[in-house]
């Protein structure tokens, strides 16, 4: 948040006070308890050996809380950060648990990942839109990750990345059987 270093100590106090006031009603709306219980059920069942959870926006926040509480890998896309609110959940989450089990992807100009303090493993990605709502779009974020993490040639870009968000079309490899334009019916 703007002036985060100045306002965050005050936010911690406000979050603590609000949690104390709303403790009873928060139990009824604590979706993270359901997701954490479900993941723990899967872990105990023994049928799954490698469980991970992911989510976008508020679902990403739930994924981060569940991952830290259940000790599984969790990835949030455009999720609000959980460092400031980690003491408001039951059981509380330590900073070490957040840093060991969670990863948040934060697009430029997306307001949701600006909420709270980021944990150590937050990856900032570009967003070339001036509209912050567009920067919250999961499809745009996926295109940015494919574009920036792919190679210069043969990067795996969806047709929508080119047509909807203006990413350059990938080059066809020398032995390619069809062009990007042919594959996307452009």
Describe the residue ranges of each PLM region:
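Residues that line or immediately flank small-molecule/substrate-binding pockets and catalytic motifs
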Residues: 55, 78-79
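Gly/Ala-rich beta-loop-alpha elbow adjacent to hydrolase catalytic centers
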Residues: 54-59, 63
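Short, hydrophobic alpha-helix immediately C-terminal to the catalytic nucleophile
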Residues: 64-68
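A conserved cap/lid and substrate-binding interface adjacent to the catalytic center
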Residues: 1-50
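Serine hydrolase/lipase
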Residues: 72, 79-186
